[in-house]
Regions:
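Short, charged/polar "capping" segments at the starts of alpha-helices
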Residues: 11-13, 148-151, 205-207, 386-387, ...
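C-terminal helical cap/extension that packs against the catalytic core
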Residues: 413-433
Length: 508
């Protein structure tokens, strides 16, 4: 089994930063950390082979720069071929789990057989690599994952070529199996070094493993990374590293001989940029794209309040729309179930995207029905995962299916609001009790729904489904073909925003 873990270490499209390293370690799952698209392919195939050989799950860290990227790759069968290590002990009945397996026997097999086999497999198949070595190395860099490509960029900006680095005694060890660290390989890497700089994104993970592996060496090098030997901050432990941060660390830790003219010039440029960062800037709150249906769908009637959700409609929190609070994706509206008992407010709206509804949000609707909550879910259908690339939502659940499912879950009243109310009218999947409205009636429909106390004895829920694709998706479809444009049914009258920029008169 190869388990892919999607991480967002800089919180670019998530509400919090994330890293899978400690989760995999706590589950005692060996973890691979690819640096680029090519290694995603290599580690993916080798990870599956590793899982078979060691009899354990194998995890792989995935970030946007490795999974949402393109790269020209030479497909070399020899690179993906694997060999089984020789001389590794194996239980007579194999390494895999079996029926009636006592817990302590499983624990012993995992700790004493499977994890050592994972290290041996990685060693035999070149997952950890000495990418640069020197016969008289004194300074070492241990790096893992995407940070390796950023390190290469920083070295290039500093004018440090491989030949120059080798001549000055630099050794670079790229760790592919981030956990468990191969202690024997770590000690071989550290032999003869005076200092090791550990480079990794976000939290320290490789650094402390390296310290553990080298602790009993007679002559062990200094290890710096997130902090230097005096405890001063060196590399950020908060998010992804960029080439500027790594270059500053290299400048601070590398021997004097590495300070090339290019490095000095780049450091001077970085200092100038840092000075510019101190200048005041005018803040600009994010806003919806021109023409986006969320611009109207996220409005609530006067006197009402809404709960934000995960997606583009989250931006409503920054606007004057009485929309606050947010939760995990799929939990939209669920906070109200506990909150409503401690407030004089009788009703609330909750925004939820169609993609979220399809994979997990429907459970919040079910929870609200079971809790007899007084809430209106606004299912915002735009047929795209707009914040992270515009992909089609998994499952591609459409408006008729959403309406039918809401009805089946026990939602008391359902209204569909769109530019073309007749588009879905008469669809056999849509219950006969569902109403159809033009978007001009959005405010009126919301006022009606907030007054609904429950159609049955226990249901107090309503749902609005604005069937309206996002603005840029309209334009994309229109460009692709006239037939697609006809399906969109754009209005004849269009509104274009005019940006007025004040230019002060010249003093000349």
């Amino acid at each position: 089994v190869l388990a892919l873990a999607g991480d967002d270490p800089s919180s670019k499209s998530s509400t919090i930063t994330s890293g899978c390293e400690y989760a995999f370690m706590d589950l005692e799952i060996p973890m691979l950390d690819p640096a680029d698209v090519a290694e995603v392919l290599e580690y993916g195939l080798k990870g599956i082979a590793l899982s078979r050989y060691a009899g354990t799950w194998v995890g792989m860290k995935c970030v946007a720069d490795t999974m949402d990227a393109t790269m020209t790759v030479m497909l070399d069968p020899a690179l993906y071929a694997t060999r089984e290590p020789q001389g590794m002990p194996s239980p007579p009945d194999g390494v895999h789990i079996r029926a009636t397996d006592p817990p302590m026997v499983q624990e012993e097999r995992l700790r004493h057989v499977k994890l050592p086999r994972a290290n041996a497999f990685a060693r035999t198949n070149g997952i950890d690599r000495m990418v640069l070595d020197s016969p008289d190395a004194r300074f070492g860099i241990a790096v893992r994952g995407k940070a390796f490509t950023v390190l290469r960029q920083a070295l290039a900006e500093a004018g440090i070529s491989e030949d120059f680095a080798r001549a000055q005694g630099l050794r670079i060890w790229k760790v592919g199996l981030a956990w468990p660290l191969d202690a024997d390989a770590a000690r071989a890497f550290a032999e003869g070094l005076e200092e090791i700089l550990v480079i990794e994104d976000r939290r320290s993970f490789l650094e402390w493993q390296l310290r553990d592996a080298l602790f009993h060496m007679d002559r062990r090098p200094r290890i710096t990374g997130k902090r230097d030997e005096a405890g001063r901050p060196l590399l950020s432990d908060l998010n992804e590293l960029d080439s500027a941060q790594i270059l500053r660390a290299l400048f601070a830790r590398l021997p004097q001989a590495f300070r090339t003219n290019a490095m000095l010039a780049r450091m001077s440029a970085l200092e100038s940029l840092a000075a510019g960062d101190q200048l005041p800037v005018h803040g600009r709150d994010p806003y919806f794209c021109p023409g986006c249906p969320h611009n109207t769908s996220t409005r609530v009637p006067e006197g009402s309040r809404a709960l934000a959700g995960i997606g583009c409609h989250y931006l409503a929190r920054f606007m004057n729309r009485d929309t606050d609070f947010f939760c995990q994706m799929g939990g939209e509206g669920s906070a109200w179930i506990g909150q409503e008992h401690f407030t004089s407010q009788e009703h609330i709206f909750a925004n939820m995207g169609d993609g979220t509804y399809a994979h997990s949000g429907s459970l919040s609707v079910r929870f609200a029905v079971a809790s007899k909550a007084n809430i209106t879910f606004k299912i915002l259908v735009n047929s795209a995962v707009a914040m992270t690339g515009g992909q089609t939502p998994e499952g591609e659940i459409d408006v008729p299916h959403i309406a039918a499912q809401l009805h089946g879950e026990g939602v008391g009243r359902i209204e569909i609001v769109s530019d073309d109310p007749d588009r879905h009218r008469g669809n056999p999947l849509i219950p006969s009790t569902v109403g159809f409205h033009h978007r001009a009636r959005l405010d009126a429909v919301q006022k009606e729904l907030r007054a609904v106390k429950g159609v049955t004895a226990f249901v107090r829920i309503a749902a609005i489904v604005p069937a309206h694709p996002i603005a840029w998706r309209w334009n994309r479809l229109k460009r692709r073909s006239a037939a697609s444009a006809a399906l969109i049914n754009l209005p004849a009258i269009r509104i274009f925003p005019v940006w007025r920029v004040f230019v002060p008169p010249s003093s000349a």
